[in-house]
Amino acid sequence: MANQLHRSRKVKIVATLGPSSDTSADIRAMFLAGADIFRLNLSHGDHSAVKRRHQIIRKLEKEFSRPICILADLQGPKLRCGDFHNGGVELCLGEKFTFDLNKNLGDKNRVCLPHPEIFQSAKKNHILLIDDGKVALKVTNKTSDVIECEVTSPGFVSDKKGVNCPDSILDLAPLTLKDKRDLDFVCDLGVDWIALSFVQRAKDIKEIKVLLNNRAGIISKIEKPSAVDVFDEILDQSDGIMVARGDLGVELPIEAVPPIQKRLVMMNTLRRYIHLNS
């Protein structure tokens, strides 16, 4: 047992807990198999489930007299389209499609996009991505409440699919009301790190710093091209970074992600900050 727990490796293993790894036996087995950090994903599960997992981890700490790091990952803002009459539509290459603020059910010509911030920042020739990039549309015209597009990558779009805006910096608060409630809850429990989603610029981190009041370290998740562009400034405000390769690969060419990851990790290492890859 002592040999299993003597871990001198520099690279640590982060294990995300969820429904399939939820019991005391599961978490214990993951710890003994080499997990150094347990990630609590606050996008899923209620506070009672988070509290139970937290208690299991802290009991393991006492049992083995070894500190175990807990990382709480905030959900962050989620951008989604509205619902359709028939649950979704097939968008074909070259077709015209419109996003608006009208809450009526969508059809083959339009759908509600209930995020005014996107209408404020979108410009002609900007790209909008739907469903993790499976469908792409180019902005051809826009007003304060309508965005007209042309389909450049066809596919099926269904109710409440995620929307990405790789060309835009959105005037969007990084913390939702849910995030603020979750933040207070996990800080009262006692966690080591908070991962902040949807970081676009350094000022996004300043709000959470005030709310945290030094109760945990801040990991900034790099998942937007705009965050890559101002990485130095983000790093100045953070205690560490997480390179979210899957999210970056939605908004950037997939072949661009590995060299970006390598560069960001190198910059981070020079400052001796913690860095995670997901």
Indicate residue ranges for each PLM-predicted region.
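Non-catalytic helical/linker scaffolds that mediate oligomerization, partner binding
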Residues: M1-S278
